[in-house]
């Protein structure tokens, strides 16, 4: 399958980057409209990326296929691509480079049927840009912070398979060091130390920040640690649709009391199998 991935890669966008990573990892024949610099192993400025470049960035050993604008338009007209994916369709506030990318839309909607075009919206906002501007007439809308089934389909983040821990670590403490939002707990400057802290902890704290989905949820699970997700009860049905919410709600009861669940090991094994089978970028 040949896929045209329309995204400018100006700045990381977790949902878009999850989808892109998964396509490459699955061996799909991807053609990029822009050079995906920060996704490649050759990228040498990971420390300047949001989240210190951990987990999904700088991981791909991949040679991008970026054609000229003229070549891309010719291939669209000839229906060379089997699918067209728009990686970031939403607008956002000041402070970020412009990630919205709707390049070639006029050509795509002229030459491609609706079932071969997909619009990805990983915005923290529940406002649905793609639906509000009628993009649903030209393709499928996929959104991580979805509130209405009629306005699109729910889609969640994923973690690269390569990031799943390879061993079964011994636990040393109840809670991992990092507490989201508390800057004095952000003490890890490399991925290995960051992951190790989760791996030796029974629970890792996480909760809704900008939106319900967050790479941190998956980083915790990937290191055989159980998320302590205190506000999960408030999560709407169409957010975190693939996340094991009910099990985490059960373990929350014990984490809240600084207690280890009596079936912690069994639950942890189940959750690790769950992330491996359902929550990687390949899934």
What are these regions (language model features)?
Residues 1-3:
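Extreme N-terminal starter segment of soluble prokaryotic enzymes
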Residues 6-16, 92-94:
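A short, glycine/small-residue-rich beta-strand->loop->alpha-helix junction that serves as a flexible
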Residues 9, 35-39, 89-90, 121-126, ...:
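Short beta-alpha junction loops
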Residues 80-186:
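Catalytic core of nucleotide-activated saccharide and alditol-phosphate transferases
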Residues 29-44:
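A short beta-strand-loop structural module common to alpha/beta enzyme folds
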Residues 5, 17, 24, 32-35, ...:
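Catalytic binding pocket for nucleotide-activated donors in carbohydrate/polymer assembly enzymes
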Residues 50-76:
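Glycine-rich, highly charged phosphate/nucleotide-binding loops
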Residues 11-22, 100, 104, 213:
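Conserved alpha-helical elements of sugar-nucleotide-dependent glycosyltransferases
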């Amino acid at each position: 399958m040949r896929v045209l991935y329309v995204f400018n890669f100006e700045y990381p966008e977790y949902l878009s980057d999850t989808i892109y990573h998964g396509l490459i990892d699955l061996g799909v024949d991807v053609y990029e409209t822009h050079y995906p610099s920060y996704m490649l192993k050759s990228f040498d400025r990971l420390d300047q990326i949001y989240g210190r470049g951990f987990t999904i960035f700088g991981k791909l050993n991949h040679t991008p296929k970026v054609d000229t604008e003229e070549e891309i338009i010719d291939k669209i007209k000839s229906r060379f691509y089997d699918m067209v994916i728009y990686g970031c369709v939403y607008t956002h506030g000041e402070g970020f480079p412009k990630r919205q990318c709707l390049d070639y839309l006029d050509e795509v909607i002229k030459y491609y049927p609706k079932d071969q075009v997909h619009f990805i919206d990983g915005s923290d906002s529940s406002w649905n840009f793609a639906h509000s501007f009628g993009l649903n007439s030209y393709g499928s809308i996929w959104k991580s912070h979805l509130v209405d089934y009629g306005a699109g389909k729910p889609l969640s983040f994923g973690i690269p398979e390569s990031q799943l821990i390879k061993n079964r670590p011994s636990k040393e403490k109840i809670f991992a060091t990092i507490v989201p939002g508390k800057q004095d707990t952000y003490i890890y400057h490399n991925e290995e130390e960051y992951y190790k802290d989760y791996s030796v902890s029974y629970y890792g704290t996480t909760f809704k920040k900008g939106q319900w989905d967050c790479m941190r949820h998956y980083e915790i699970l990937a290191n055989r640690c159980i998320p302590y997700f205190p506000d999960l009860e408030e999560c709407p049905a169409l957010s975190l649709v693939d996340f094991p919410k009910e099990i985490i709600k059960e373990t929350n009861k014990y984490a809240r009391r600084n207690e280890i669940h009596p079936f912690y090991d069994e639950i942890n094994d189940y959750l690790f199998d769950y992330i491996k089978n359902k929550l990687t970028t390949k899934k």
